Every structure is written in structure tokens, then in C-alpha cells.
Design a protein with these regions (language model features):
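Conserved beta-strand and immediately adjacent loop positions that scaffold enzyme active sites
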Residues: 47, 61, 184
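Short, P/G- and charge-enriched loop/turn segments at secondary-structure junctions
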Residues: 30-39, 132-135, 170-175
């Protein structure tokens, strides 16, 4: 991505909203906002760093999930994250973008980490903006970084749900694909939970290095 492109303001009024199929998942339509005169387009993504509730926050102690069926020792872990689909972003054209992002990240956390109750969920103000290799020059994506807290009881319940699913493989098979993308949950460790993909390592460096959150 060109170095001189600032973080584009996806919260400003007057942006067009739409959805488009992308090459990596052509069976889905992904939500975007587009500037009516400048022409840039941003696909919206969200990532959530979940800490244990009721104890002092340690920036390097957050929950990560493992890619379904992968070797736990491989680069197969990441914080819960995902990209907003058109069916979610276009339901109400007047719904604020921040609210859409909050709903999106809660949905991703429930699908990937089996966590249903997040306390004090908030947008950290951190945004990772970049481009995929097949994007046109004026198309971008943004990861909006959220922070939340989870009780030990909710973490234990989610872990039990993963255990039950491992013990009942036919139940896994019956689940929608987007609900079985991940199959384990644990605390981040720089040596034991190696990060997958292009963007998870950058998101972690951004989050852990920012002193304002």
C-alpha cells in the first residue's frame, strides 16, 4: 500500500454502502463503504482482544483461537476477527458504522471463540489499513481493533463447548462452515501460539505497542 495514504475516515457522513463478492470467498458478499466523489472504497473488518475480567490487564494475555483441524504447534492461531458481510452491513442503511462494527465483532467472537458474553466492549481507536494483492489501487480494508473482558466462568463454558464438539464430531459436521472455522481456545503465548496469516501478527504488534489502550 502506498505510504502516503492516511487512515480513511469510514465514520464520516455521506459514504455509499454496498457489498461485493471477493475472490477469496466468492460465495459471500462483503460489505464496504465508498466515498461518493473521491472514489476510495474500504471493506470493514474487526478484531477483538479479550482479557480476563476482574484482574489487572496484561496486554500480552488475551484469548486466541486455532484454525480448525490445524496443528497447534504450527502458525494456526489468531485473535477472533473477521470481515463484515453485506447481509449484516446493509440491513439498516441508517445504522451507524461503529454500531455495525460492534455487532460484527461480537458475532465473530461467538462464532470463533464460543464466547457469548463480552464485558466493556469498546473500540480502541486502533485501525490497521492495508490492501490485498488483488485490490484495485483505490480499494482498501480496515481492521478496527476492539477490546473486551470475559469472566473466568464464561471462558470455562466456552472451553467446555469446544471439548463437547471434539467429543461429538458429527455435531461439528452439522454446523455452518463459519461456525467451525476454529476448534480451540487458549491464552496467547509468543512461543506456543504462533500467529497465522498476514495480518494477525501486525494486529498484535499494534495492540501491544499502543500505550493508550
Amino acid at each position: 500500500m502506498p505510504k502516503d495514504i492516511p487512515i480513511l475516515d469510514v465514520f464520516q457522513p455521506g459514504l455509499k454502502r454496498g457489498a461485493e463478492r471477493l475472490a477469496f470467498a466468492p460465495h459471500k458478499r462483503y460489505f464496504y463503504v465508498e466515498h461518493p466523489t473521491e472514489g476510495w472504497r474500504v471493506y470493514l473488518r474487526a478484531c477483538c482482544f479479550l482479557h480476563e475480567a476482574g484482574v489487572p490487564v496484561k496486554k500480552d494475555r488475551f484469548l486466541v483461537v486455532k484454525r480448525f483441524g490445524s496443528n497447534p504447534s504450527a502458525k494456526s492461531w489468531e485473535p477472533p476477527k473477521g470481515q463484515m458481510e453485506g447481509k449484516d452491513g446493509l440491513r439498516d442503511p441508517k445504522q451507524p458504522i461503529l454500531q455495525l462494527l460492534e455487532e460484527n465483532v461480537q458475532r465473530e467472537v461467538e462464532e470463533e471463540a464460543k464466547i457469548k458474553e463480552i464485558l466493556q466492549l469498546r473500540h480502541t481507536g486502533l485501525v490497521l489499513q492495508s490492501q490485498e494483492k488483488d485490490y484495485p489501487s483505490n480499494h482498501f480494508f480496515q481492521y478496527h481493533v476492539f477490546q473486551g473482558f470475559v469472566t473466568p466462568q464464561e471462558i470455562a463454558r466456552a472451553a467446555d463447548e469446544f471439548k463437547w464438539l471434539h467429543d461429538h464430531p458429527k455435531a461439528w459436521e452439522r454446523m455452518r462452515k463459519d461456525k467451525r472455522e476454529k476448534d480451540d481456545l487458549t491464552w496467547f503465548s509468543p512461543t506456543k501460539t504462533k500467529m497465522m496469516g498476514r495480518w494477525s501478527p501486525s494486529l498484535i504488534v499494534m495492540y501491544m505497542g499502543d500505550k493508550s489502550v
